Amino acid sequence: VYDAAAERLTKVRREAAVRFAKAVTNEMQTLSMKGGRFEVNLVPIPRSEVGVEKCEFLMAGHPGVDVSPLAKVASGGELSRIGLAIFTLTSRNTSVPTLIFDEVDSGVGGATGEVVGRMMKQLGQTRQVLCVTHLPQVAACGDHHLKVEKVSDGIETVSYLRELNPTQRVE
């Protein structure tokens, strides 16, 4: 019984992996990773309650580069943008109440910043999204803005967080 169930699960995973990889690869093209590729590798594991394989995410950030494990080759900004793409693609099927993105726009320009901002705004329709950003294109998509200010007296540095009013948001 287990072997038959595991075989069915593997078949479903293979089919889903192809669709998911194609969707993430498409999102990468709009997130300043032109020519990049995303793949899902099914890695055999000993029999367990989750089947006989686990999923490994692979990526190539540029054309002509072989795919490698995502965790080993992605920069912080690439990892954040791929995470954003994955959350956007899976948001209908997950119930994560809060997402936090730290400089997801790192290393990108204005046009990509607009795409990133729109994707986060879409996610924000069904959950809370917090984002640390320096790009006005990303910030413009937010509903509320907080400013982090650091103050130093020469001995110690203290950070303050304050909510911005509509006038302060455009400064």
What is the role of each PLM region?
Residues 102-103:
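Walker B catalytic acidic pair
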